[in-house]
């Protein structure tokens, strides 16, 4: 299985989801001055921001991470979290990233996710990597 990369704000909702998921993952730092470089294909797990609009939906730290061509070249899919209170914009960071990076939007979950979300993501990630060659 290939990598998961995620961002979680100080609310830690996405971090708690990733802990429960129990798969190896790298966290994009909260501090924008800290940078990471990912050297293998990965799926990005990202929360949506902005109170329901597309503007500001993708966290700044994630934008900075993806603006590094090395990192952007290795993204293979995106999973988004959000709040259903945002209506149609629920999980919209996933849509924005999928469109801009030309990768599939694989799944979305609310806040910390449910056990069903954990099970679906675990299964979906495994199936995704089996269908996609690691070198792709």
Swiss-Prot record:
Q: Which domain of life is it from?
A: Bacteria
Q: Which SUPFAM superfamilies match?
A: Flavoproteins (SSF52218)
GO terms of biological process kind:
protein modification process
Q: Name one GO molecular function term.
A: FMN binding
One Pfam match, by short name? Flavodoxin_NdrI
- What InterPro entries does the entry give? Flavoprotein-like_sf, RNR_Ib_NrdI_bac, RNR_NrdI
Function noted in UniProt:
Probably involved in ribonucleotide reductase function.
| Entry's family note | Belongs to the NrdI family.
What this protein is called in its record is: Protein NrdI
